[in-house]
């Protein structure tokens, strides 16, 4: 609808989507985490070739996962539920066992307070924060594909994306479908809105907050205040300090981080 026209915007947003979601940055981070869990240390410059091979294998694994399973959304759903259970079980366990409950209150109130601007200001970090927040535009569009493939609302009328192997042919409409505004359809529409509100408030918002809370609560409790967190090693500080309690936590913590990165990929 906007100039210079649909052909330009199709290419423009496809390029943005590729650099945000298709560029294998998450695969590289997941590979570093997996290698760190295996080697007992975070990979460095001598390990770059190995890390690149592991990252390539992870990208290939994602392609294979999406190639099977009837419809893509069903395979993604199986993996998402499994990974969600693994991540939250680990985070809840270590928080309950090793973080004093008085610290839980401090972390919770910190979500509603502003402690000031750090000095010196790291504008690169602030820019990355702003970019991550803004990236939800295209990212959320990809989530709507799952809603459509699941058949929610009018999604059942426009088809789904079949997997390359094992999926039966499903005709996918290029345009949306609007229901006639009859009294019966409006009743169904209001019912779907209740599902949407429950999903956004209780599933999406609540679990996003819990995920942030548990990670921040653990990090601020076990990592000494003022620790300089830089580079790939920044993701290993929780594993390092938890391993002082029990060496096995090095692997478990990094493997948990790997699940998070791999699921996002």
Where do the model's predicted regions map?
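Junctions where cytoplasmic loops transition into the N-terminal start of transmembrane alpha-helices
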Residues: 143, 147-148, 153-208
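Select transmembrane alpha-helical segments in multipass membrane proteins
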Residues: 4-18, 53-59, 118-130, 209, ...
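Membrane-water interface regions at transmembrane-helix termini and the short interhelical loops
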Residues: 37, 41, 60-81, 94-101, ...
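Membrane-water interface at loop-to-transmembrane-helix junctions
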Residues: 121-123, 182-209, 238-259
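Flexible loop linkers connecting adjacent transmembrane helices
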Residues: 1-8, 31-45, 70-75, 224-245
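Hydrophobic alpha-helical segments and their helix-loop junctions in multi-pass secondary transporters
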Residues: 85-121, 126-145
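Hydrophobic transmembrane alpha-helices that form the core helical bundles
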Residues: 7-44, 55-56, 264-265
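Extracellular/periplasmic helix-exit of transmembrane alpha-helices
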Residues: 173, 177-181, 185-187, 208-237
């Amino acid at each position: 609808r906007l100039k210079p026209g649909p052909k330009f915007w199709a290419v423009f947003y496809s390029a943005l989507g590729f650099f945000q979601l298709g560029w294998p940055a998450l695969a590289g981070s997941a590979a570093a985490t997996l290698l760190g869990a295996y080697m007992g240390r975070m990979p460095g410059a001598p390990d770059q070739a190995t890390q690149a091979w592991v990252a390539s294998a992870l990208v290939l694994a994602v392609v294979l996962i999406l190639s099977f399973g009837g419809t893509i959304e069903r395979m993604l759903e199986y993996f998402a539920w499994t990974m969600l259970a693994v991540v939250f079980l680990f985070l809840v366990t270590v928080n309950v066992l090793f973080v004093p409950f008085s610290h839980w209150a401090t972390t919770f109130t910190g979500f509603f307070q502003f402690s000031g601007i750090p000095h010196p200001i790291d504008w690169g970090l602030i820019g990355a924060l702003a970019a991550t927040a803004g990236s939800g535009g295209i990212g959320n569009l990809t989530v709507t594909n799952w809603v459509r493939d699941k058949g929610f609302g009018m999604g059942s009328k426009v088809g789904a994306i079949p997997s390359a192997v094992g999926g039966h042919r499903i005709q996918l409409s290029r345009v949306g479908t609007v229901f006639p505004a009859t009294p019966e359809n409006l009743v169904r529409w209001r019912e779907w809105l209740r599902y949407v509100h429950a999903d956004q408030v209780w599933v999406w918002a609540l679990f996003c907050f819990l995920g942030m809370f548990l990670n921040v609560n653990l990090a601020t409790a076990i990592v000494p205040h003022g620790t300089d967190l830089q580079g790939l090693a920044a993701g290993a500080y929780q594993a390092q300090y938890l391993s002082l309690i029990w060496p096995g936590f090095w692997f478990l913590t990094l493997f948990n981080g790997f699940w998070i990165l791999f699921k996002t990929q």
